[in-house]
Amino acid sequence: MSILFSPAQIGTLQLRNRIIMTPMHLGYTPNGEVTDQLIEFYRVRARGGAGLIVVGGCGIDRIGNAYGMTQLDDDRFIPGLRRLADAVQAEGAKIVAQLYQAGRYAHSALTGQPAVAPSPIPSKLTGETPVELTEEKIAEIVASFAKAAKRAKTAGFDGVEIIASAGYLISQFLSPLTNKRTDRYGGDLQARMTFGLEVVAAVREAVGSDYPIIVRVAGNDFMPGSHTNTEAQVFCQAMEKSGVNAINVTGGWHETQVPQITMNVPPGAYAYLAYGIKQAVSIPVIACNRINTPDLAEAILQEGKADFIGMARSLMADPELPNKAMSGHPEQIRPCIGCNQGCLDHVFRMKPVSCLVNAEAGREAELSLTPTSQPGKILVIGAGAAGLEFARVAALRGHKVTIWEESDQAGGQLILAAAPPGRKDFLHLRTYLVNACRDLGVEIQYHTKATPENILSAVQEGKFNRVVIATGAHPITPPIPIEEGVKVIQAWDVLAGRSKAGQNIIIVGGGAVGVETALLLAESGTLDNETLRFLMLQQAETEKELYRLLIQGTKKITVLEMANGIGRDIGPSTRWSMLADLKRHQVNCLDETTVLEIRREGVLVKNAGTQKILPADTVILAVGSRSQNELYQALQGKVEYLSIIGDAIKPRKVMDAIHQAYNEAIKY
């Protein structure tokens, strides 16, 4: 880690290392005022070793605002911001405020007034048509950027970042998709850059010549007809000439159809965008998006693709990532898995952000893992996500913990979740939990089937004085008539590799498990990455043919869902891309379809009042799960300290299981 942990500068700002916590919308400031929740969240990340923390977005006015956003539009916010700056700086990190104006991405229901934009082009995010900005109003917004920057400086912040990416207001002026103006702010690229340049000039005048200014740009908008990396380089060169001290390079707009930070994006996939900018400018460049490990961060720096590394969700997952890596213990880092369940999905639902893998995220002000005053001997039944997390936290608090696991491996449904394409990061979480338990002295006994008798015997012998049931759930077989001789298997068995499907497959159930199973099977017979790379390098096939070979597998797949819509239980930040993949792989999806019978010749279904047979050689069931709580019921009243966690209570998402297990463990 010779480069990652070396000191570096952005303008006059000296940083202790090259790890930058890039801005995240957290929703921790419901009234715009800095809260203790926000302060403790960032204090912990600063203490964990980050070199720079970028807070944001911070609203420069109310018309371009978002819910729960920290505000910089009035002097009354300065005292709270000063408390935040003091807290971060006291831990050795520096702090920067990101100046935010959403433009057409703002929602009138939140701001109380129509959104504004360079041109009245409807927003795909809000469904609203913004009001076209007058030149007078443009001047007001430019002034608001400057005033907000001045307030950040007055509050003791070490610099400011101007957001010119993600499809927000400056992006909207830059793009020909959203800027149809005929005045000096519209037309060719030079004219469309005018607004952004005016913002930078006004901010520079407000804060002085030696105050650091960063601009966050889209290395590629990933919007057909908008900016590519070529235009981004021209804009960044103009930013450098205007006095900007660093460029923070991210990916596309929020409405792009190219995934940006979901789990299926390969780690470091967009570092090439930062490298393109770095070749065009001489000021420092920050690489972002799915850079989740210190080793990857160091490799990007060693290859000369960037000068700094942006990590946001990685530091939400583990605030101590820098310190653990610097001390030579990267294996102890709790991994961000790119699931988006607690972060981006919560933003879309206008909820405060949390984290699937880190139940403490956003709760730093209220939680403190203190040693227990009464160390116990705890038996946990089941080494799934909930059982492992409970064991980890209980052991941290000083309990002696043993896990009985019936199978030959830990992880439970994390292993199933990792099976579909682009989902392997769930295995990183499994590895972390198993290793953390091992390091804390938790004993996992495999091939150990728990019964009421052997549990009670172990308790009576004094081996354990507390029992936690984490037996999870099992898949449901619905009460559908099934003709003898038909191949009917469970989706869980397909995901686990225990059952093989034929060539003409019907999946009953179009929720998350059904969709994931379909995507796994749809890749059967498609080009693998190594072959694709070889054929591309040799120019052996046309791009069109390579694309066909990449998406066209050897199986015919149909997904049936009784309700309206496919994948309705998948988070909004991920669902759209998974549905797009189903379409790409030509998976046939039928919703509002009831399965009546499963016969040798196929599946009898009813759709829109009409019955028909859908031919199939394999039927896969993905219709939900049921809690396995028989042990808990059998032990009630017989074990003094008995509790139940995770899916054993009620089937739930992994995040809910982990958080509930954590909450239970801190009670012990």
Curated annotation (Swiss-Prot):
For activity, the cofactor(s) needed are: FMN; FAD; [4Fe-4S] cluster
The record's GO molecular-function terms, alphabetically, read: 4 iron, 4 sulfur cluster binding; FMN binding; metal ion binding; oxidoreductase activity
Q: Which residues does the record give as FAD binding sites?
A: 341, 386, 405, 413, 423, 450
Gene Ontology terms describing biological process: catabolic process
InterPro entries (alphabetical): Aldolase_TIM (IPR013785), FAD/NAD-bd_sf (IPR036188), FAD/NAD-binding_dom (IPR023753), NADH:flavin_oxidoreductase (IPR051793), OxRdtase_FMN_N (IPR001155)
* Compartment list: Cytoplasm
Residue positions annotated to bind [4Fe-4S] cluster are 336, 339, 343, 355
Q: Where does FMN bind?
A: 23-25, 57, 98, 216, 290, 312-313
Top EC category: oxidoreductase
One GO cellular component term of this record is: cytoplasm
Q: What is its EC number?
A: 1.16.1.-
Keyword terms of this UniProt record: 4Fe-4S, Cytoplasm, FAD, Flavoprotein, FMN, Iron, Iron-sulfur, Metal-binding, NAD, Oxidoreductase
- Please provide the record's free-text comment about the domains of this protein: Has an FMN-binding N-terminal domain (NTD), an FAD-binding C-terminal domain (CTD), and a 4Fe-4S cluster between the two domains. CTD is the main contributor to the iron-reduction activity, and NTD and the 4Fe-4S cluster are not directly involved in such activity.
What's the stated role of this polypeptide? Metal reductase able to reduce Fe(III)-chelates to Fe(II)-chelates, as well as soluble Cr(VI) and U(VI), using NADH as electron donor. Cannot use NADPH as an electron donor. Is unable to reduce riboflavin and FMN with NADH as electron donor. May have an in vivo role in metal reduction in D.reducens, which is an organism capable of reducing contaminant heavy metals and radionuclides.
Q: Which family does it belong to?
A: In the N-terminal section; belongs to the NADH:flavin oxidoreductase/NADH oxidase family.
User: Partners and quaternary state?
Assistant: Homotetramer.
Name of this chain's protein? Metal reductase
The record lists the organism as Desulforamulus reducens (strain ATCC BAA-1160 / DSM 100696 / MI-1) (Desulfotomaculum reducens)
What is the taxonomic lineage of the source species? Answer: Bacteria, Bacillati, Bacillota, Clostridia, Eubacteriales
